């Protein structure tokens, strides 16, 4: 049984929902545990990405997995997602997400007593994590990335998404529903995840939101590259799912080659599509991270 706690951290007038899990409640005077901050993508909030509870399923919660292994695990809902507030300004793009992280990380360091965090992001969350690390390298021990897009070259998903770029560019939010979540998991490789997963996401997300921001979609279609590997000094892990339609392998290898650190790994996981933590073979993702 894990211990959990909810917080709110302010970035200007935006209230950011922050969620934490450990194997037990913190005790006065104890040594700091290693901290892992998990950064969500374009559609599903932090808690419902990384602490998803799937009826009849097991090991879907990345937070539980790493809490059980001694980590102090955190996630945040970015502006306009989940339980966080929405200012009505902008569209919660990738740079705004990096600003969210810049507001949250000092709070995490104060609460935990840690000097640095380990940070992992998936999809547009990987871009947010990169941008944060570039701006605040002194706070990041290790960086993990999955479903990353660098220049966007060779990405069939982005090629299709660009057809709706005029719509995304003129509206700050887009609608989500069960059908949309189901499409997310059938887009790359039908059968790579259980049908119960999008249903569990809908049950968790739709009581909170019926729309999510468009900013990261616009950024990934029109404003790449947003990550600058030459400016990332820390040890870095890049994970690509075999069937991921966003993360084209040559594009990622170009990113990987530009990382200055010699402490780096590039991992391709067979049987996995765009959402590695929610696939049938999610144990491979857990092992890699």
Name each region found by the language model.
Residues 1-30:
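N-terminal cap/lid segment of alpha/beta-hydrolase-fold proteins
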Residues 25-71:
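Short, surface-exposed "cap/lid" segments of acyl-processing enzymes
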Residues 98-116:
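Conserved acidic catalytic loop of the alpha/beta-hydrolase fold
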Residues 115-120, 124-152:
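Conserved hydrolase catalytic core segment
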Residues 154-239:
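Alpha/beta-hydrolase
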Residues 245-251:
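Conserved alpha/beta-hydrolase "acid-adjacent" motif
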Residues 259-275:
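Catalytic histidine neighborhood in serine/cysteine hydrolases
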Residues 272-284:
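Catalytic histidine-centered segment of alpha/beta-hydrolase-like enzymes
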């Amino acid at each position: 049984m894990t211990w959990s706690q909810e917080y709110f951290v302010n970035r200007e007038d935006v209230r950011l929902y922050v969620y934490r899990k450990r194997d037990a409640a913190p005790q006065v005077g104890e040594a700091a545990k290693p901290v892992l901050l998990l950064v969500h993508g374009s559609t599903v909030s932090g808690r419902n990405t990384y602490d998803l509870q799937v009826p009849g399923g097991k090991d879907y919660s990345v937070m539980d997995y790493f809490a059980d292994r001694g980590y102090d695990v955190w996630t945040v809902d970015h502006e306009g997602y989940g339980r966080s507030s929405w200012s009505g300004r902008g569209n919660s793009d990738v740079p705004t997400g990096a600003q969210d992280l810049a507001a949250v990380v000092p709070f995490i360091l104060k609460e935990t007593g840690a000097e640095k965090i380990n940070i992992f992001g998936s999809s547009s969350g990987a871009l947010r994590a990169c941008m944060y690390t570039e701006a605040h390298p002194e706070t990041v021990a290790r960086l993990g990335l999955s479903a990353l897009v660098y220049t966007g070259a060779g990405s069939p998903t982005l090629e299709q998404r660009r057809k709706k770029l005029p719509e995304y560019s003129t509206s700050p939010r887009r609608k989500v529903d069960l059908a949309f979540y189901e499409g997310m998991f059938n887009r790359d490789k039908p059968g790579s995840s259980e049908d119960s997963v999008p249903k569990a996401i809908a049950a968790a997300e739709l009581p909170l939101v019926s729309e999510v921001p468009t900013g990261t979609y616009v950024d990934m279609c029109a404003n790449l590259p947003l990550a600058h590997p030459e400016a990332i000094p820390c040890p870095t892990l890049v994970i690509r799912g075999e069937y991921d339609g966003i993360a084209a392998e040559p594009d990622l290898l170009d990113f990987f080659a530009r990382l200055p650190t010699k402490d780096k790994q590039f991992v391709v996981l067979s049987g996995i599509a765009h959402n590695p933590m929610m696939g049938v073979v999610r144990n491979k993702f857990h092992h890699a991270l």
